[in-house]
Structure formats: C-alpha cells, structure tokens
Amino acid sequence: MVSRCTHARIASVNTSRNPGLLWPGNEEIVQDTGTNAVYLDHAATTPLRTEALEAMIPYFTEVFGNPSSIHTLGQEARRALESAREVVSKVLECRASEVVFTGGGTESDNAAIRGGAFALKQAGNHIVTTEVEHHAVLHTCHQLENFGFEVTYVPVDSDGLVDPEAVAAAVTDKTVIVSVMYVNNEIGTVQPIREISNLVRERAEAIGRTILIHTDAVQAAGYLNLSVKELGVDMLSLSAHKFHGPKGVGILYIKRGTPLVPLLMGGGQERERRSGTENIAGIVGTATALKLSEEERESTSIHCRELRDRIIAAIPELIPGTLLNGHPIKRLDNNVNVCFPGLEAEPVLLGLDLKGIFASSGSACSTASLEPSHVLTAIGRPADIARGSLRITVGRETTDGDVDYFLETVQSVVQRLRELPSFRLHNR
C-alpha cells in the first residue's frame, strides 16, 4: 500500500442540503452522511505534497530575492532556480538548459505550438495533431488557422488510439509541427509516442523537412516514463499541479537547437525562451514533487492500477448498461471513464458530491460547457451518451475503503435517478 498523503483527504465536508441543488425525487440522495471526503478527481488536480510545501516556504519569507538580481539574496534565489532545473532535467533525461519553467501546462502547450509554428512559418504552414487533444492544443491550432496555417486533425479509433501510420501519412512538404498528447486527459488512453516520433522522423527525412514533434505529457507524470530520449520528442509539456506540485507552474522541455519564437516578451528570462520573473517558490515545489513522483512511480502505478481495475470490473455489474470509454488496456493506471446511457453527468456528480465524493464529467477546463465532450464524440459516442460521462481518477492516497464507498454510492445514486419519472419518460 502506498503511504497516504496527509493533505489528500479533506478532514470534513459539509454535505448538508443545498436547496439550489435539489431536484424532484432526490431528497434521499442528498442526505448528510457526515463522512470524510473521497477525492476521485486527480486528473483535474492533485493535493500539494507536504514535502513540496515545506520546500517552498523559505522562498516566500526568507529567500525572496529576484533571481535576476546580482546581490546575495537574488543569487540565492538563482541557485534554487538552477538546482530545481537540474532536478527536472534528471527526470526528463535532458540537459538542464533545455528545461523552461512556465505558468502551467496550457502556457507550455501554447508556447510550443505557437512558438514553433511562427519560427518555421517561412518553411511551411501545416500542423498535424489529433481530434482528441486538450483544448490548450486544439484552440491554439484553431487560432493559428486564422493566421494562415493549415491543420490536419487525425481521427482516433473507438478506444481513443491514434494510428501512428495515419499521423505520418498526414505529414506534407509544408508540415512544421506534429503534436500528439501522451495521455488523454478524459479517457486515459495512452498514445504510442515513440512509434509516432520514429515514423514522423522517417517521413521528414524522406521529404527533406525539419518537423518539430511535441507531446502534451501533462497527465503522464508520476505514471509513465518521461524520458525525452525514449519518447523521441523535441518539446514536452508538464503541469505541476497534476503531480502533487503547486498550481501556476508548468514545464516545457525544448530540445537544444529547436527554433522557437517566444510567447512572452520582456526581460529575457529562461534563456530568452519565457520572459517574466520566475516563481521561485513554485518552481522549487515543482521540482520536489516531480522528483518524488518519479521515485514512487512504480509503487504508485501498481497501487492505482489495482484500484482502477476494481472499479472497471465492478461498475458494469452494479450498474447494467455501463459503457467504458478509452482503451481497456492501454490506459493510464489511475483513470476510469464511463457513461450511463440515459443519464446526464450533472445529476450523478451532484449526487456523489452530496455524499462527499468528488469526481468529474471530463476535462476540468471545460466542465461549464453544455457541449458533449469532443473526445467522446471523436471515439464515436452519440452526443446524448457523451453528455453522461463520469471520470473517476484515483491517486496515491486513495484507499480500498474509498473505492468501496464510491461503488456503493454510485450504484445508489444511479439507481435512484433511473427510478425518477423523468428518466422513464426520456427513455421510453
């Protein structure tokens, strides 16, 4: 069993009735249980590790100098910054000079794709990506289309896997960037990045092109190998709060010699790749969390995989008609994504929330949208079913008891909702 993270479980949650969250017939669902919270939304964010917090505190109150200052306090901050960069470089198996700290995963994706596209615009105006990327990639590509770039969105199969041959086949003599995510943030499908990079390199060599390869690896940290040598990429994005680090800090690996126009202009920090005074406390916490996540990767993966497999096996037995989204095997160790046909996600999530269980319907970056998940529609789910997806993502601190309570509760919530007249009328 993986040791529990002391900040992972909220001590108590007020699950008393909220009139604004009631709907006819759910009175039994929303009764106050008085239980501790069960957090099952680790794909959205993770609790800050105690070790990371403790490492950060001195840089808020004592070593608060600007790392660009030449005085002693500034140089102490500079040493902390470069030490953190070394830690990250060891995990990524790259040079420290190739590590750039950003404000988060979204900024890292934007900097990689926009920066690479504009740097190579004279050579070509074509980008290749997939239909199931995070919005930080998709919306960036959509915007670049307004600047004269052409984008090919390669489809995926019913499990969310992209065919590496299809990615390579999409490359033309105008292609400048290929961006494929390492792990899908909604359904957990793991893409064959090494195979994709090999085929794209071969294709680029055959047509005499320089093509940059980027992967959004935000969901992979702590579960999969992040070696850029093994992955064969030119750029890789990470976000600290996905691996028990602080919010507001990202990482962008940029291979030496990669042409890139900076997204942010200013004082030329981060070797002129990302201007702006560095967030030293956040960066120190990020390096601490990433190092520990890598050291514990095997044990965390085993622990989470066992819990994940329990949930995947149990839910269809408890709730007939359940559909599993994502690849049954090639998926992240902590991810479960299911649909309950005939039910939308919101009432299920509210029912769980009012019992002290926190999950989500998909990407936390777009949960306010009424549109069905673009990922689920890309794998062939009809819009009405896609709107009913439930994403459960366990973590290093999740226990067997948490899973027991979740399974018991989700069965009760779904059963109660299916007994409502509105459900029976809708599904006649």
Q: For each predicted feature, which ranges?
A:
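Pyridoxal 5′-phosphate
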Residues: 4-5, 10-14, 18-428
